[in-house]
Amino acid sequence: MKKKTTSLGMKLVAFLAMLMLFCIPVSAGVKETAGEYEISPTPQEITYGDKEMQLTDQVKLSIGSDIDDYTKTRITDTLNVLKLTGNESAASDKTELIVGVYGSGDAADTYGKANGAVQATFDNYDAYMLNVKDGKIVVLGKDTDAAFYGVTTLKRIFEQLSADKKIKELTVTDYAEV
């Protein structure tokens, strides 16, 4: 009887050990390398430039007319992460945040098309492009919901910045895979 109990106990221990192997978290997706931002969920593509951009405490806002109130609130929340103040009349030497919709003809659409936005990307569900370069941060969404997701990605990046408020030049392209 004692031998049977030991055998059953060993099987139970072996089973639990195997079960624990499947409970260990596994990292999936793109691994960040040193100096890259951690963005979750992982975007379709991130391209980093060679420079960093200094954010100013005052941010000039240019928000397209197709952007809804929820996205405008997300913009304010994003700026608040670094205690930045946004307004439409900030001086031209300030960081500029431009948010708009692809195909609308607004400032974000014009900038995006001149800086790599392609129709094929925006044929996808919830597609957006986030571009940080030359004193400008541009979020161009397929629609206002996609622009919201782009601003949310910017918020995640802002949460990782140090007190010096320097952000790497980059382009993020993302869309949902359904």
Positions of PLM-derived features:
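N-terminal secretory signal peptides that target proteins for export/translocation
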Residues: 1-8
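Acidic, contiguous N-terminal accessory segments
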Residues: 28-178
